[in-house]
Curated annotation (Swiss-Prot):
This is Carbonic anhydrase 2. Homohexamer. It is found in: Cytoplasm. The keyword Kinase does not apply. Belongs to the beta-class carbonic anhydrase family. One of its GO terms (biological process) is carbon utilization. GO terms for molecular function: carbonate dehydratase activity; zinc ion binding. PANTHER family: BETA CARBONIC ANHYDRASE 4, CARBONIC ANHYDRASE. It comes from Flaveria linearis.
Amino acid sequence: NPTLYGELAKGQSPKFLVFACSDSRVCPSHILDFQPGEAFVVRNIANMVPPYDTIKHSGAGAAIEYAVLHLKVENIVVIGHSCCGGIKGLMSIPDDGTPASDFIEQWVKLGLPAKSKVKANCNNLEFADLCTKCEKEAVNVSLGNLLTYPFVRDALVNKKLSLKGAHYDFVNGAFDLWNLDFGISPSLLQ
C-alpha cells in the first residue's frame, strides 16, 4: 500500500506500546490485527517488563520512555501466551538457586513474584497448569513493574495512558484482556 507507507515515511504515531514474547508462534501484530504504524512493539523472552532502573535492562526502559514521552502512546498492553518456554523455564528454576543458564534464567527471574504467588496459591496443580497460571500472573507483575517508571505513573494519573494485561491461548484460540486497579492517585507521585 504505497499511500500507507508514504504516510509512515513521515513519522509514526502509534496508540499502543505492546510487550510480547519473542516466541515465533505469537506475533502481536497478527494477534491484535495491527497494521504498520499502529503499535510500538517490544518483544523479549516471556514478555517481561523489568522495573525502572537506569542501568539494568535499559533497553526496555528506553522503549517505554520513548513510547510514553515521545510517541505519546495511549495504551500499554502486556501480552502473555500459552505454552511459553520462558515461563516454563521460570517455573523450573530450582529452589536451591542452582543456575542453569547465563542470560535466560537471569531475565526470567523478573517473574519470580509471579512464580511465588502461583506456587503459594495453586501448588496442588499439575506443572502445565501451574505454568498457565504463571503466564497470566507474570503479566500482572509486568504491569506492576510499569508503575515503577515515573513517566508511566504520571501519564496514568493524568488519564493520558491505560495499562492492560492480556493472555493469548493459541492452542484453544482464546484471548483474554484485563485491567488491574492499582489505586493510582496524585499523592503517589510525590
